[in-house]
Regions:
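Beta-propeller blade termini
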Residues: 31-39, 50, 87-96, 144-154
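Short loop/turn segments that connect beta-strands within beta-propeller blades
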Residues: 17-20, 67-70, 122-124
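Structural motif
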Residues: 7-14, 55-65, 110-120, 167-187
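Secretory pathway targeting signatures of secreted, lumenal, and periplasmic proteins
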Residues: 212-267
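Surface-exposed amphipathic alpha-helical segments
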Residues: 278-306
Length: 306
């Protein structure tokens, strides 16, 4: 493709090659971004054009297929996308639970919130679908956290994050209340997100903690101490902060090596700049967790991802 005077609009250019000759295909399509993959499970790749909203174009996903007889690309199906997206942040193709390829699109609003849309071709109805986008309802994936869809468990399937604040009282400083990131896979048959696991991120210090499966929603919460560089886990009971369960803290490496304020802590991991350690493990709470499980649940964050 090639750009136009509008940075959000590109014109598509396609060519076919046969018997040593290159021929230009008839294409009358513009786009903001595109991806090629087999979206309708017919063994042949299609071209998925994504368009941001402009005064000239609606926000759409448009699936083009090649006609050898007519020597052109034509639109097989299209679907509306969120017109409030100002730029695409991350686009990837992944296999859904039924093995079908779906397009996962992370985009940004003008306020930099991120939202995920899932574009897939319904083979039974021969229509393109975008089930997470509802014109009058908020997309459940909308998040201020700088987190994009990614494969969190190395199964070659991209997972979708839903971010919420953990429980707190009405008078608490919400900046000290940690997020919970719920990771989900997508089921095209029912168009639902299937919950896989939860993680608690410490964005400032670059790590996360995977919530034990035995911890039920609404029974725990986490507080962040930016000055201490600590993340403390608590019981949560009937809108009240309960007993402390344990704490994870990030130390500067030189601070850790000389034992400054770190005697009570057990090392989880250290790199060239930071030592991560835990302390205050309370074995008398309903959420008690072993030291080995704390170490296993710890993981470093990468850019934009857990």
């Amino acid at each position: 493709g090639y750009t136009t005077y509008n940075s959000s609009i590109n014109n598509l250019a396609c060519h076919s090659y046969s018997n040593g000759k290159t021929n230009r295909l008839t294409v009358e399509s513009s786009y903001s971004s595109f991806y090629c993959s087999d979206f309708d499970s017919d063994g042949v790749n299609e071209v998925m054009l994504l368009s941001l909203y402009t005064t000239e174009n609606d926000a759409t996903a448009n699936m083009l297929v090649y006609s050898e007889e007519r020597n052109c690309l034509y639109s097989k199906a299209s679907v509306k996308m969120d017109p409030n997206i100002t730029r695409f942040k991350n686009i990837t193709v992944t296999a859904a639970e039924n093995g079908q390829n779906v397009l996962i699109v992370d985009g940004c609003f003008a306020n930099d919130d991120t939202v995920t849309q899932i574009i897939y071709f319904n083979t039974e109805l021969s229509v393109l679908r975008n089930p997470l986008f509802k014109e009058k309802d908020k997309n459940i994936t909308q998040r201020s956290a700088d987190i994009i869809c990614t494969d969190i468990n190395n199964d070659s399937v991209t997972e979708i994050p839903v971010v919420d604040k953990l429980p707190s009282t009405s008078d608490e400083d919400k900046s000290a209340v940690a997020d919970k990131i719920s990771w989900n896979s997508f089921y095209p048959q029912s168009e639902i997100l299937n919950h896989l696991s939860d993680q608690i991120p410490d964005y400032q210090n670059g790590y996360s903690f995977t919530v034990p499966e035995s911890w039920a929603d609404g029974t725990y919460t986490v507080r962040l101490d930016s000055e201490k560089r600590a993340m403390s886990f608590f019981e949560w009971d009937s809108d009240n902060l309960g007993q402390k369960v344990f704490e994870i803290r990030a130390f500067k490496l030189e601070q850790w090596d000389v034992g400054e304020d770190s005697d009570a802590y057990t090392l989880i991991y250290k790199n060239e700049s930071t030592a991560y350690a835990f302390a205050d493990v309370n074995e008398e709470t309903s959420l008690s967790i072993s030291e080995d499980d704390i170490k296993t649940a710890f993981s470093l964050m990468t850019v934009n991802n857990i």
